């Protein structure tokens, strides 16, 4: 009996690992990662968790470190705590202390060896472009407005399909990266138009610093007939970073899903709200000449 009681006491004293599925509007944040100056998603979450649990120190670790202004509808993170609060109640408890720009949709108990970042098998990002000819105040926080021409999504998709596979993406890596190389595997790409919105999904085992925004900037140049598909391929295959100058703005980008060998949250939860607007195709921009 004493041994059982002792084992139970030890079990209760061990830290518990809690996984979170998080959404945030990145507009008002300096990115996910805690910074010396600026409001980060990580710092706000850590303050909220610390206020609810005595386990110290609290560090919230994310699957993807999104940049300043980038959103997330399917970010996954974890932290260790005392277990005082049941795992499935953490979402509601945190939402009561977080600003409206951050919402925790689910919380779950995971083994202490599970890691939000290192256990992930892929990340999926979506970039959304508003291609209507008139400004739209309510879409501007979530989309890049390209109104000059109607984007040629067929050419963009042709260029996009070519990046699938294991490649060196030096052309799409911003300065300041601490990675030893620019090698990664793009597993899936998908470009689709819904009315005046053009969405670009990219799924990879890992992403380089600034990769999606630089890539989208080049795809838009293809879609506006400023460069050819062949020129797009030449730039990235020859690692011509100096010729990849225009990066898409951060507000159109969202981390929409993180994959694991065993999915711990409902698989489609990240797709149920953002960004899937239903727009008409009235008054399209003129086609590029």
Swiss-Prot record:
Gene behind the chain: truA
The first-level EC class reads: isomerase
Amino acids binding substrate: 125
User: A single Gene Ontology molecular function, please?
Assistant: RNA binding
GO terms under biological process: tRNA pseudouridine synthesis
Give the transmembrane region(s): none
| EC number(s) from the headed UniProt entry | 5.4.99.12
Share what the entry says about its subunit structure, partners included. Homodimer.
Q: Which UniProt keywords apply?
A: Isomerase, tRNA processing
Family listed: Belongs to the tRNA pseudouridine synthase TruA family.
Active-site residues, Swiss-Prot/TrEMBL: 67 (nucleophile)
Q: Which reaction does it catalyse?
A: uridine(38/39/40) in tRNA = pseudouridine(38/39/40) in tRNA
Q: Which InterPro entries would you find in this protein's record?
A: PsdUridine_synth_cat_dom_sf (IPR020103), PsdUridine_synth_TruA (IPR001406), PsdUridine_synth_TruA_a/b_dom (IPR020097), PsdUridine_synth_TruA_C (IPR020095), TruA/RsuA/RluB/E/F_N (IPR020094)
Taxonomic source organism: Prochlorococcus marinus (strain MIT 9211)
What protein am I looking at? tRNA pseudouridine synthase A
What is the recorded function of this protein according to its Swiss-Prot or TrEMBL entry? Formation of pseudouridine at positions 38, 39 and 40 in the anticodon stem and loop of transfer RNAs.
| Taxonomy, superkingdom | Bacteria
Query: Is rRNA-binding among this UniProt entry's keywords?
Result: no
